[in-house]
Amino acid sequence: RKNNAYFEKDEHGNRLPYLEAIAITFLPDKQSEFLQFVQGNLDFLNSLDASYKDELLTNDGRLRDTYTESVNMIRGPYLNTEYLGFYLDSKTPEIQSELIRKAINYGFDRQKMMIYLRNGIGNPAHGGFIPIGLQGHDASLGFTYQPDKAKQLVEQFKKESGISNPEITLTTTSNYLSFCEFIQRELEKAGLIINLDVMPEATLRTARSNGKVDMFRSSWVADYLDAENYLSIFYSKNFAPNGSNYFHYKNTQFDSLYNKAF
């Protein structure tokens, strides 16, 4: 409901908010959600789902002519990072290997993935875990697409480990299967076999929290506008299942700097 005592005003001096109330609806089926939107039963969608992206957008991310009169599309940085996570307490040699983890980061083209699987909606995460639009994002961090480097790292792992056909199981949900299949094909070129395991969101969430999956696709959406919200999931005292450090990542220097940031 509207807060009649809210203090802010717009640039013309009109008191905010404009609306009397907002009704929020949660629909588990994304296609049903889009249908409700097209029929005028919903006023706003906050994300783009693969099930209807090609109906709504052209290949280069513009609204199709059918919707230009009825839909106002606003594009901007969204405080959400999609990522691949490694469970570092796994006994799997490939997961334990920094060579393989780096090879995965170098081995697939994030820009191409955004163009073909999201119609250009989204930014390739070349600048680390903190997303564009939030203070702390640094475009010089992270990994760029270097397929030859990825192949070199996989070959180095083979020589050092004696494992001639390295492979990892990547767990995902059906909504993100196309992303994971893209990554699977790209990494096969580098000599790394990626097996895909698809499960329901609730099942994956439980398995991820309890360290039952070696590698998984997930996302992190900011609860508040501070980079600490993203860095907190790497803090060693936040180990899952009691916290959000699903990776069981532990680094003494990181923990020290994280604490000093407060």
Please give the residue ranges for each predicted region:
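Append "and occasionally in soluble cytosolic enzymes with long acidic Gly/Pro-rich linkers
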Residues: R1, Y6-E8, H12, E94-R185, ...
